[in-house]
Amino acid sequence: MSDFDVIVIGGGHAGCEAAAASARFGARTLLLTHRLETIGAMSCNPAIGGIGKGHLVREIDALDGLMGKAADRAGIHFKLLNRSKGPAVHGPRAQADRSLYRAAIQDLLAATPNLTILEGAAGDLIEENGRITGVICEDGREFRCGAVVLTTGTFLRGVIHVGHTQTEAGRIGEAPAKRLGERLYALGLQMGRLKTGTPPRLARDSIDWDNLPADPGDAEPEAFSPMTTAIINPQVVCRISHTTAETHRIINENLHRSAMYGGAIAGRGPRYCPSIEDKVVRFAERTSHQVFLEPEALPGNPGGDLVYPNGISTSLPADVQAAMIATMPGLENARIVTAGYAVEYDYVDPRELLPSLQLRRLPGLYLAGQINGTTGYEEAGAQGLLAGLNAARATAGNEPLTLDRSDAYLGVMIDDLTLHGISEPYRMFTSRAEYRLTLRADNADLRLTPKGIAAGCVLPEREAAFTAQKAELDAAMARAAETTFLPQTLRDVGFEVSLDGRRRTVLDVLASNGDHTKLDTLAPWFAELPLRVRRHVETEARYDGYLHRQDREIRQLASESAIALPADLDYTAIGGLSSEMRERFSQARPTSFAAAQRVRGVTPAALVALLAHVRTLS
């Protein structure tokens, strides 16, 4: 008998979600991490969510994950990004007190049944009969299991760079996972190197706050999770500084001392979170870049004396960092407590993975997070939840939970990764999704909680809350569809409608442009609805026609694309395929005709040949 059903290696955002999801399913789960006190640590920026990323947090929460609940407990500055645009692209974001976030994650894990947490560094994997069956720790301990989820973050043969000084580490002061990296290379997996970076941390009391523009949060903070009843922490106001022409001069004169531009780093960095060196070089015409000064914690809490200057991650030497910081408004006398640095690490080409996040060539081994080429807490957490759940389901003999691009941003991300791979760290944006109107942050629970209940990762408390909330939403939608007004009645309160004798429902009124508060006098019950319910009704009314059209498109695509492709399909045996198309299909190994349509560079002729061949097989 195995010691555990599932072993999760790594206690970062992916590992915590993986372990919790596996345990919620009922699998005997071990979370193995090199330091217990760093479980749930925010290694880089002290924030959760954002544009696209906030959708992922809501989706994690809809599947009863941890991140949204922890962010609500730790949040000290909430803001809904893209508020001036449509609800489909609204991006909930919260800055968090680092110490409170870490404590919240650890508390949530401690309350999770079926979960054991042990300290130890994984050194090797046990392979038997072509599948992974356990883990060997560097201290010699062995644990047997049915599946392993590997969430190594930046630790896989990690190297930290400050200028030309290199240190083997996955995070400042923490040793890398060298043996695991060597083990994966020995498996013959397609692998590469990526890099990410972090800015210097500044002493809070050394900043001249008085003359810096304020960046306040929302007056009414909006929680990530519907399970959160109140935001309890004091809310802070951030400030904004900026680089100057002098900052850019110092950076340009010292580019040769940067690890990135000095040739010490081979790995690609994230396009959408560039270092300050990259910004100055790539956008040479700009004389200034904003720097958001974000407190790392509330005063009096651990880290409360530190500030995160968002926007200036760097691998320049410490002396250059100090010189450039001093050229920014409000930071003339700022003290650097910890220098910024870049970290380079191994990743596995995500095309090595099935959509379940299990390795194609090695059953029993699942990968999640930065090891798959992504960047960001939210991307890691979402992958971790799916990998942990699917590992647990596999040990119980169940099929994996797979999400389509029309189901979730998580489905979009997994499809992008496993089908196309990456050439730089992958970050989620709303622009990556074809079905943005359907995949809103505000309806994540309606989209995914039923799937989570069916898959076994939603606990009874969350299921009961969802059932009650859905009944409330359904009742409000039904009443809004049944309540009608004559045109003259609507005109009397200021709505511009034709006097055509046709009665308008509340939904009709909400779908029109204009000031909808005038509706309060005609339907006071609507004004009395909880804000979350009222917004849902307004959004559904506003997008009704578009949503129906998008639903038709999704159903049509599903009917044409649902044909499954055999895992062992021999593409070299398909007549009519060019050698290039055979190579592309063989490398991508699409699991369905829908996935085959999205293989990079595929031609219509190749799709016709593939479809004809598969039909002859069936």
Swiss-Prot record:
Q: Listed disulfide bonds for this chain? A: none
Annotated NAD(+) binding sites? 269-283
PROSITE patterns registered for this protein in UniProt: GIDA_1, GIDA_2
A molecular function (GO) term: flavin adenine dinucleotide binding
List, separated by semicolons, the cofactors it needs.
FAD
Q: Name one GO biological process term.
A: tRNA wobble uridine modification
SMART domains hit by this protein: GIDA_assoc_3 (SM01228)
Q: Give the quaternary structure.
A: Homodimer. Heterotetramer of two MnmE and two MnmG subunits.
Quote the function comment for this protein: NAD-binding protein involved in the addition of a carboxymethylaminomethyl (cmnm) group at the wobble position (U34) of certain tRNAs, forming tRNA-cmnm(5)s(2)U34.
For this chain, the family text in UniProt reads: Belongs to the MnmG family.
Q: What is this protein called?
A: tRNA uridine 5-carboxymethylaminomethyl modification enzyme MnmG
